[in-house]
Amino acid sequence: ASLAPSEMCIRDSAWTLLDVSAIAPYRPINFDDLGADILGLDLGLLGGPQLAALVFRDTRMFRRLDALDPVHTGKGARKLETPISSGLAGGVGPLVDHLAALAGGESGSRRKRLRTSMDALSAYLEELRADLYSFLSTLPAVHILGVTGEAAAGASDDRLPRLTFAVKGVPAETVYKRLFDNGLVTTLAPQTPLLTEMGVEEIGGAVTVALGPFNTYHDVEHLIRVVASLA
């Protein structure tokens, strides 16, 4: 019988490395839930400094890694450190404090406040996400990539509050400009092999919209009205 990737890692004493930069702005991150040993995180995508980090499940893992710093060759994390700007590093703490304060909690350790805040943020954004997907999918001229059409067959319902869509017969730049003129900032989806395979170029491109902690139900309704005026 075939083995799942995680089972192969356990059998061969290998480690699983996951880049969680895409989900970290929306959900609390837990090693056990993800089945990972090392997590990669781009702090810039969280609104922080342009730094990235690798987070290890257990400090004993450092013993198996070669040193990057010839001066520090011990068993700890110091041997893996590379020089970074102190100014950039100084922005990490305030970023965490900001995320920990989103839910308004002021008591408990920063770790506890961060967990409480991210749990609340995840629940709130999930409600906004459900409305965004539900209302946008009711517009007959709108195609949500990976959600409607053949490519969505068998797709998971566990989604982030971010989607890419196209409006039939309307170039993506026109959609983008109409949204921007109405106070809605989105992004033109870049050309990638995956999007090309999904037929994005054939329909005139697509637009990506992502929700954040300061978005409201009114924002979702406003976006739907503007898109409906095009569709």
Segment roles from a protein language model:
Residues 22-26, 191-196:
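Short acidic loop-to-helix transition motifs that present clustered carboxylates
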Residues 14-46:
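Conserved PLP phosphate-binding loop immediately N-terminal to the Schiff-base lysine helix
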Residues 45-124:
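Active-site C-terminal subdomain of aminotransferase-like
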Residues 176-187, 193-231:
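PLP-dependent enzyme catalytic core of the Aspartate aminotransferase-like
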Residues 80, 100-167, 196:
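Conserved small-domain helix->loop->beta segment predominantly found in fold-type I
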Residues 1-10:
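Single conserved hydrophobic/aromatic residue that forms the stacking wall/gate
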Residues 15-17, 38, 162, 185, ...:
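Structural preference for beta-strand elements that scaffold enzyme active sites
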